[in-house]
């Protein structure tokens, strides 16, 4: 585990560290996307990584249903949705928990959700909730605003009922299980690539933007926050090691450019 007390400018990322990178983990909302849409420079950056033979896996709190079209259409190896519980690889879907566990957890979560909506009158479920299979989500900044006190109360209710709770840039997510973004990364890296993530950690970089990325910032020596992470800086116990000059999708593209520019230029053979 790393313990970063300050964020260094992306330009200070050592070239030898960048050259070791063979895989990228990234958040989606407000990291790859800007105002809910992936900008051209971020999509182009994904294509560049694919062409360079660098694995790209998105890890998000978004639901499996919301993520499915992007898993098919974007140049990604996989999307791990619902904070590590569901993996989408092209048209295929994999679950971390078995069907019985998921069904039991759905019943428990529905009761917690009813409590939240009763105790916090301003709370609203996220508009993407229909596509959720293993968690619940309360909107705090995407289509509906919750103040800090209401957010804290929602988190408290989830945790009081034995749930894991995280706050992203747009939602409060809660679920039953010990999984998180890091466990999801370990799971899919082994399942899809046959690689032991912890034995190969210096070959990966994580890119994120908010408090629910902290477990990744804490674990990865190579971690980058896009510039809009400054909004959450005071709330972060673990900072990313580096920060981009630009926000959101443009910042993601800057990380990719930094990686690719560090690679040795192939010498033509006669």
Regions found by a protein language model. Give the residues of each.
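Non-catalytic pre-domain segments flanking phosphatase-related domains
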Residues: 1-26, 270
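Mg2+-dependent phosphoryl-transfer enzymes with acidic/Ser/Thr/Gly-rich catalytic loops
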Residues: 14, 19, 39, 182-270
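Short, well-ordered beta-strand core segments
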Residues: 24, 49, 79, 223-225, ...
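Active-site phosphate-binding/coordination module
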Residues: 35-130
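Short, structured coil segments at secondary-structure junctions
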Residues: 74-75, 83, 161, 219-220, ...
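Conserved acidic, metal-coordinating active-site core of Asp-based
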Residues: 115, 119-219
């Amino acid at each position: 585990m790393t313990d970063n007390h300050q964020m260094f400018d992306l330009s200070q990322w050592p070239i030898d560290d960048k050259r070791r990178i063979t895989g990228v983990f990234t958040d989606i909302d407000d990291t790859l996307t800007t105002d809910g849409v992936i900008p051209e420079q971020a999509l182009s950056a994904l294509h560049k990584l694919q062409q360079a033979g660098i694995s790209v896996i998105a890890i998000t709190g978004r639901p499996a249903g919301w993520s499915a079209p992007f898993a098919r259409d974007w140049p990604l190896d996989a999307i791990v949705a619902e904070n590590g519980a569901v993996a989408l690889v092209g048209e295929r879907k994999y679950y971390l928990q078995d069907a019985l566990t998921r069904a039991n957890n759905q019943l428990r979560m529905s009761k917690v959700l009813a409590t939240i909506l009763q105790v916090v009158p301003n709370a609203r479920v996220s508009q993407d909730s229909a596509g959720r299979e293993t968690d619940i989500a309360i909107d705090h900044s995407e289509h509906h605003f919750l103040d800090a006190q209401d957010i804290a109360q929602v988190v408290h209710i989830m945790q009081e009922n034995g749930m894991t709770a995280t706050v992203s840039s747009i939602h409060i997510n809660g679920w039953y299980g010990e999984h998180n973004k890091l466990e999801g990364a370990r799971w899919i890296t082994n399942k899809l690539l046959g690689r032991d993530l912890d034995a190969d950690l210096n070959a990966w970089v994580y890119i994120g933007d908010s408090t629910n990325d902290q477990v990744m910032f804490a674990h990865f020596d190579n971690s980058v926050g896009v510039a809009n992470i400054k909004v959450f800086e005071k709330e972060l116990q673990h900072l990313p090691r580096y920060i981009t000059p630009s926000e959101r999708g443009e910042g993601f593209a800057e990380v990719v450019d930094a990686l690719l520019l560090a690679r040795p230029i192939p010498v033509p053979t006669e």
